[in-house]
Amino acid sequence: MTAIIERAPAKINLGLDIQGKRPDGYHDLSMVLVSVDLCDYITVDHLEEDRILLTSNCPRLPINEHNDVYKAAYLLKERFQISTGVSIFLDKRVPVCAGMGGGSSDAAAAIRALNQLWQLKLSPRQMIDIGMQIGSDVPYCLFAGCAQVTGKGEVVKPINGRLSSWVVLVKPEFGISTRTIFWDIDCETISRVPIEDLVSAIEAGDYQRLLATMGNSLEDISIAKRPFIQKVKDKMLQSGADIALMTGSGPTVFALCQTEKQANRVVNSLKGFCKEVYKVRTL
C-alpha cells in the first residue's frame, strides 16, 4: 500500500457551555463545534525498521511521545501488536497552542490514516476509545463537521444542518493554559450558553438566531487574564463582523461573515494589529 494522506482541519466553538463539575474533577461540557478549511496534513507510510518515525515542518513541535500524533501511533501499534514500523510526516499549518484543536485533529487524522495503512478495520467506537486516551477533543476530530459534543468530549452527535460562512481567525502572540482557565471556573456564576437553541438554529438554517444563541462560558475568564482578547473582538465588530467570539479556552478569536467582501474588511482592519490572521470557510 502506498503512503496515505489525511487532512486535519482546525475547529471553532460556536457554543461552549459549562454545565457543572463532575466527581472526577472534570467539567461537564456541552459544545457546538464546526470545522474550518485551515488544515494540517498527516502522511503515513510503512517503515522497515520497527519504530515510529515522526517528522514535521514545524520545529516547535516535539517529535516523540510528547506529541499526540506519536501517542496515537504508539497506542495503535501496541494494542494491535503491529510488528513493522511507520513513518509519519506532520505538515503543520494550523497555529500551535491556539485553542483550535490542532493537536487533537492531528491525532485523529493519524488514527484514521493508520487504520487504513495497517488495515485494522476499526469501528467508530474503537477509534473513539483510542482517541479518548489521547485527549477529550480527539473523538470529535475523528469525524469533524458540525456537531454537538457532550460529556468529557466522548459523546459526538452530528447536527443536521450546515453553516456556510466565512470565518476570520486571529491568533494572538500569547498562549493560554487551558488548565488554568478551568481551575478558575465558578459553576454558580459562570455565564451559560443555550446550546439546544443554538443546535435548533443551525438545523433550521436561521443565521440570525444562530448569532443570538452563540456564546462561550470560558470567554470572561480568559479575557480577565488577557484583555487583548476583548480588543480583538471589538476590532472585528467595528469593521463589520456579524459576531466575534473566542474559541475554546482561547486565545484565538474568530469572526463570522456572510460574504467574502465583509470578511476582507475584517482582515484589513486587523493589519498591523495582529500578526496571525486567517480568512477561511466552514466545512
Swiss-Prot record:
SUPFAM superfamilies in alphabetical order: GHMP Kinase, C-terminal domain, Ribosomal protein S5 domain 2-like
GO molecular function: 4-(cytidine 5'-diphospho)-2-C-methyl-D-erythritol kinase activity; ATP binding
Keyword set includes ATP-binding: yes
Active site per the UniProt annotation: 11, 137
EC number: 2.7.1.148
Positions that bind ATP: 95-105
Keyword list, A-Z: ATP-binding, Kinase, Nucleotide-binding, Transferase
Top EC category: transferase
GO aspect biological process, one term: terpenoid biosynthetic process
InterPro entries documented for this protein: GHMP_kinase_C_dom, GHMP_kinase_C_sf, GHMP_kinase_N_dom, IspE, Ribosomal_Su5_D2-typ_SF, Ribsml_uS5_D2-typ_fold_subgr
Domain of life: Bacteria
Pfam families the record matches: GHMP_kinases_C (PF08544), GHMP_kinases_N (PF00288)
Catalytic activity: 4-CDP-2-C-methyl-D-erythritol + ATP = 4-CDP-2-C-methyl-D-erythritol 2-phosphate + ADP + H(+)
NCBIfam families from the UniProt entry: ispE, PRK14608.1
Protein's job: Catalyzes the phosphorylation of the position 2 hydroxy group of 4-diphosphocytidyl-2C-methyl-D-erythritol.
Family, as annotated: Belongs to the GHMP kinase family. IspE subfamily.
Protein name, per record: Putative 4-diphosphocytidyl-2-C-methyl-D-erythritol kinase
